[in-house]
């Protein structure tokens, strides 16, 4: 028999029953968490406020409270980063969800303007059927920015800018090595984004 806990969302559960990680101990972030069951080691399922998409959320990150969703569910911004700022390499994700948007070239042009340069998008193999993903990179002395455009056949899309930054104490070579490792984690999060239809599936 069920004890009732399985039917509760993390935001409704007793804090003592939640995983002892930033994603659930932060009051704002846990509102986005779909379940206390890991989707893979170190990652939990997040569902957006628009119910437009899910993703695998890193357990040691928190969502910025400037994130918001429009009441009509056509737009959402989702911003998250590591809770601990005193680490060697830090990520900040800025995700914009839009629906409906059918003109992908318009989206790329808009992202070029945001980046302040012409982005060289490259296709990646998508995990989910009828979804598409292209990414580009911007590199400067201390920051690697990964840019992703993800969309599907139902005119849903996310535009993502993720900065991977090294702390000032890290030298150039070590920074590049750390950013390479972090790049793989970031791309895995990109690929985990799954669009939902109006029935939440």
What are these language model-derived features?
Residues 1-72, 169-201:
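N-terminal targeting sequences that direct proteins away from the cytosol to non-cytosolic compartments
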Residues 36, 46, 70-71, 80-81, ...:
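Short, exposed beta-strand/loop patches in secreted or surface proteins that constitute
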Residues 44-106:
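Secretory pathway targeting signatures of secreted, lumenal, and periplasmic proteins
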Residues 101-120:
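A contiguous binding-surface segment within folded domains or other stable secondary-structure elements
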Residues 115-137:
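Short Gly/Thr-rich strand-loop-strand
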Residues 129-201:
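Short, well-structured beta-strand
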